């Protein structure tokens, strides 16, 4: 048994979609979450800068004595996950491979779409992972740089959000049967995305898919939390306005949380 927390990092609030699923599946596990909303979005930034920012988030989580780190950010996973994983002696998990694997299982026509930040799409990592496991699957990737700012400003239900999603996704409509939400912010726009793509298109939440892998690693390294603990204390940190973070988090997690400001 290991009662230390699992650390989550993201460029902002998007990683809460992963946290929500973890709380549902593994309610006995403690969480420490750091969202770098002050510098979001990461997607348009140069690789070197993304690596620097990611390491700052990692080092912050290490000061919290976490037992595992989850990259709840596709951009950080694409750019820095392998380097961080090789450097640390605790498990480090990314969201891309679980999302790619789920897409392969989902598609019936071999037509998969991937939406993500400009950096994630430019890295071509989803196509590489999917076609490594299933070479016959066709992958269409599309950068959606306007989605993260919508979420970070808590405008997911606005008319402008609907227009941006519609305009952004139009190149994929009618061409795929499975769509990977290749950014953990995007599930917060899920109802609009589903409406645009149509009910027959299966949406894959890459962040939620990785919770299964978290459970596997906890068992493999024998670092599960206390199954009998009914109430666990989570900690949430943001580099931006805690009130905005708290507002979005409370809606998504369906509970009120305390959010602390941190300067990296």
UniProtKB/Swiss-Prot annotation:
Keywords: Cell shape, Cell wall biogenesis/degradation, Isomerase, Peptidoglycan synthesis. PANTHER family: GLUTAMATE RACEMASE. This is Glutamate racemase. It comes from Streptococcus pyogenes serotype M2 (strain MGAS10270). Its EC number is 5.1.1.3. The keyword Isomerase applies. One of its GO terms (molecular function) is glutamate racemase activity. One of its GO terms (biological process) is regulation of cell shape. Belongs to the aspartate/glutamate racemases family. InterPro entries: Asp/Glu/hydantoin_racemase, Asp/Glu_race, Asp/Glu_racemase_AS_2, Glu_race. Provides the (R)-glutamate required for cell wall biosynthesis. The keyword Cell wall biogenesis/degradation applies. Substrate binds at residues 10-11, 42-43, 74-75, 184-185. It holds the Pfam family Asp_Glu_race. It comes from the Bacteria. Gene3D superfamilies: 3.40.50.1860. It is an enzyme of class 5 (isomerase). The active site is at residues 73, 183. The gene is murI. Coiled coil: none annotated. It catalyses: L-glutamate = D-glutamate.
């Amino acid at each position: 048994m290991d009662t230390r927390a699992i650390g989550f990092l993201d460029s902002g609030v998007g990683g809460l979609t992963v946290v929500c699923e973890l709380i549902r599946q593994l309610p006995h596990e403690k969480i420490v979450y750091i969202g770098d909303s002050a510098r979001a979005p990461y997607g348009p930034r140069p690789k070197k800068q993304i690596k620097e920012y990611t390491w700052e988030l990692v080092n912050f989580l290490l000061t919290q004595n976490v037992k595992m780190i989850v990259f709840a950010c596709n951009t950080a996973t694409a750019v820095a996950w392998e380097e961080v994983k090789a450097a640390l002696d605790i498990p480090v998990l990314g969201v891309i491979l679980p999302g790619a694997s789920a897409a392969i299982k989902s598609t019936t026509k071999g037509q998969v779409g991937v939406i993500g930040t400009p950096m994630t799409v430019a890295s071509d990592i989803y196509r590489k992972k999917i076609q490594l496991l299933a070479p016959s699957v066709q992958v269409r990737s599309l950068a959606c740089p306007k989605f993260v700012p919508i979420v970070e400003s808590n405008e997911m239900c606005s008319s402008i959000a609907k227009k941006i999603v519609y305009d952004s996704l139009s190149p994929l409509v009618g061409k795929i049967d499975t769509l990977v939400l290749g950014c953990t912010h995007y599930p917060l726009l899920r109802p609009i995305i589903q409406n645009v793509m149509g009910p027959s298109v299966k949406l894959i939440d890459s962040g939620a898919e990785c919770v299964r892998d978290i459970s596997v690693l906890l068992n493999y390294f024998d670092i599960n939390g206390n199954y009998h603990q009914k109430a666990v204390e989570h900690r949430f940190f943001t580099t931006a306005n805690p009130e905005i973070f708290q507002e979005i988090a409370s809606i998504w997690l369906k509970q009120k949380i305390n959010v602390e400001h941190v300067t990296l």
